[in-house]
Amino acid sequence: MYRIVLGKVSTLSAAPLPPGLREQAPQGPRRERWLAGRALLSHTLSPLPEIIYGEQGKPAFAPEMPLWFNLSHSGDDIALLLSDEGEVGCDIEVIRPRANWRWLANAVFSLGEHAEMDAVHPDQQLEMFWRIWTRKEAIVKQRGGSAWQIVSVDSTYHSSLSVSHCQLENLSLAICTPTPFTLTADSVQWIDSVN
């Protein structure tokens, strides 16, 4: 089972949460995203299982809970990938111009990923950049790694993991799963509010 749920940070961060959870939220700029992620999780799973943190800080359910999840955010958008198949990773990015995106692609993309960029019309290369970037991030996050490891990931390399991508309007969404799964717009659930 794979479940992909998307929502808005600005809406979900104000949603009701189980007792005590709001008090656990960090202060500062990460607070709204943290609250929105917990709101998505508690909406999807009730009651919300205990959450622990891995060596690199990746949140997970306690080992006795046979479910895995990953959260990602970009701008006001947040994504949750939930699975009963094993460790998962997801990444969402708003497709937007980025001043140094070509330099970044040259610094971290593999030869195969560069070939994908070169295969599309120059007008489509920014979208392709975000497609490749989200795939790489999803793989790193599935492994529980840090963003610094993105350079060592080749999203064109065929491994035992399944990597799938979908563009949803101005969003690039990628998931990395331990078993085959094809991400489509129909497999994504949108949450407007949580009561």
From Swiss-Prot:
GO cellular component term, pick one? cytosol
Pfam family membership, one: ACPS
Q: What keywords were assigned to this record?
A: Transferase
| GO molecular function list | holo-[acyl-carrier-protein] synthase activity; magnesium ion binding
Please state what class of enzyme this protein is: transferase
> What is this protein's function?
May be involved in an alternative pathway for phosphopantetheinyl transfer and holo-ACP synthesis in E.coli. The native apo-protein substrate is unknown. Is able to functionally replace AcpS in vivo but only when expressed at high levels.
Output this protein's name.
4'-phosphopantetheinyl transferase AcpT
Q: What's the source species for this entry?
A: Escherichia coli (strain K12)
